[in-house]
Swiss-Prot record:
It comes from the Bacteria. Residues 26-46 bind DNA. Residues 75-84 have a biased composition (Low complexity). Represses a number of genes involved in the response to DNA damage (SOS response), including recA and lexA. In the presence of single-stranded DNA, RecA interacts with LexA causing an autocatalytic cleavage which disrupts the DNA-binding part of LexA, leading to derepression of the SOS regulon and eventually DNA repair. GO terms for biological process: DNA repair; DNA replication; negative regulation of DNA-templated transcription; proteolysis; SOS response. This is LexA repressor. Keywords: Autocatalytic cleavage, DNA damage, DNA repair, DNA replication, DNA-binding, Hydrolase, Repressor, SOS response, Transcription, Transcription regulation. Its EC number is 3.4.21.88. One of its GO terms (molecular function) is DNA binding. InterPro entries: LexA, LexA-like, LexA/Signal_pep-like_sf, LexA_DNA-bd_dom, LexA_repressor, Peptidase_S24_LexA, Peptidase_S24_S26A/B/C, WH-like_DNA-bd_sf.
Length: 242
């Protein structure tokens, strides 16, 4: 769920892009939302990126890709300091100071063929620490842009623990996992140990053994026989909520 400020900013960016063909500047966004500094805009844009609504394009000034908008936004009031109610939104990429760019090619997969985000089941919690009981049944679902996933079957798990912090995975994050039973050395995987315990670790191989490596020096690497470990999937994306 987005905060009011996040919704206001998304609505303002959408409206400005439709009216002018270019995204607003940070100063314009700051003034529109009546914020005292541009750092607040940076935080809002980062939060919208992490929730799959916006994406900033690297090495380009004022380049913002709008991936999706919540359904409620199409029915909401006009954006701050925007004179007319925005038309129904069509995703596009625009770059400040230039004319509107054409939609990204199909290979970019910003949205699926029906124009909706993809629903990913959340299958409980996963330990980024000491292993926990095997993966539970689906508890709820989240929606993501197809940009966050490639082909194949996916599911999400809520992280518990701090053993993967140096890989940028924090307690409370949602990890998106591509379901597969093989992985390459160095991949972060969901490992099922002895068909009882599930853990999120980096895969290493030591001879015929499997090493489950933490990204935190406080945790030891576990080395197990291949008959004790089953790969349940590979990390492909991460969602952080605030």
């Amino acid at each position: 769920m987005l905060t009011r400020k996040q919704l206001d900013l998304l609505r303002f960016i959408q409206s400005r892009m439709q009216e002018c063909g270019v995204p607003p500047s940070f100063d314009e966004m700051k003034d529109a939302l009546d914020l005292k500094s541009k750092s607040g805009i940076h935080r809002l844009i980062t939060a919208l990126e992490e929730r799959g609504f916006l994406r900033r394009l690297p090495n380009r000034a004022r380049a913002i890709e709008v991936i999706r908008i919540p359904e409620s936004l199409t029915q909401a009031a006009p954006a701050p300091q925007t004179p007319a109610e925005p038309r129904r939104f069509t995703p596009s990429v625009v770059e400040g100071g230039k004319s509107k760019q054409p939609p990204a090619p199909a290979s970019t997969r910003m949205i699926d063929e029906s124009g909706r985000a993809i629903s990913i089941p959340v299958m409980g919690r996963i330990a980024a620490g000491t292993p926990v009981s095997a993966i539970q049944n689906q508890s709820h679902a989240i929606t993501l842009s197809p940009d966050f996933v490639a082909g194949g079957e996916h599911y999400a798990l809520e992280v518990r623990g701090d053993s993967m912090v140096e890989a940028g995975i924090l307690d409370g994050d949602l990890v998106v996992i591509r379901k597969q039973d093989t992985a390459n050395t160095g991949d972060i995987i969901v490992a099922l140990i002895d068909d009882e315990e599930a853990t999120l670790k980096r895969l290493r191989r030591r001879g015929s053994s499997i090493a489950l490596e933490a990204a935190n020096p406080a945790y030891e690497t576990r080395v197990l026989g291949p008959d004790r470990v089953r790969i349940q999937g590979r990390l492909v994306s991460l969602v952080r909520r605030y």
